[in-house]
C-alpha cells in the first residue's frame, strides 16, 4: 500500500528536528452541501532542520518516531519569503544612545 502524502504550510520550527505542518482540506457538509475548509496540524520529522515558518512542504507517512510524530518532511515545495531573509541583529548588545 502506498504511503500517504500531504502538502501543507509550516507553522512552527522551534523544536529540534521537528516541524508543525498545517494541512487544509475542503470537506462537503452532509446536509447543507456547502464546502468547508478544515485545517489539521501534523508533527513531522525534519532531519536537517531545513524548514522555516511559512514554507510549503510535502510530508509523507512513516513509522511512529515519537508520541506525536508519524510523518517525515519529504521535500520543500516552496520557500517562504520570510525564511530567505535572516534578520541582522546588533550583537554588541549596546544601545544607540551615545551620551
From Swiss-Prot:
Keyword Glycoprotein: no
Task performed by this protein: One of the primary rRNA binding proteins, it binds specifically to the 5'-end of 16S ribosomal RNA.
Organism field: Thermosipho melanesiensis (strain DSM 12029 / CIP 104789 / BI429)
Gene Ontology biological process terms in this record: translation
Originating gene: rpsQ
Organism superkingdom: Bacteria
GO molecular function, one term: structural constituent of ribosome
Protein family (similarity comment): Belongs to the universal ribosomal protein uS17 family.
Alphabetical list of InterPro entries matching this protein: NA-bd_OB-fold (IPR012340), Ribosomal_uS17 (IPR000266), Ribosomal_uS17_bact/chlr (IPR019984), Ribosomal_uS17_CS (IPR019979)
Record-given protein name: Small ribosomal subunit protein uS17
Lineage: Bacteria, Thermotogati, Thermotogota, Thermotogae, Thermotogales
Amino acid at each position: 500500500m502506498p504511503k500517504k502524502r500531504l502538502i501543507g504550510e509550516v507553522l512552527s520550527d522551534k523544536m529540534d528536528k521537528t516541524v508543525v505542518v498545517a494541512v487544509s482540506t475542503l470537506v462537503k457538509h452532509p446536509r447543507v452541501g456547502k464546502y468547508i475548509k478544515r485545517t489539521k496540524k501534523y508533527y513531522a520529522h525534519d532531519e536537517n532542520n531545513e524548514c522555516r515558518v511559512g514554507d510549503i512542504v510535502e510530508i509523507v507517512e512513516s513509522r511512529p518516531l515519537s508520541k506525536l510524530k508519524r510523518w517525515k518532511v519529504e521535500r520543500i515545495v516552496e520557500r517562504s519569503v520570510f525564511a530567505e531573509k535572516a534578520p541582522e541583529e546588533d550583537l554588541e548588545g549596546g544601545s544607540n544612545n551615545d551620551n
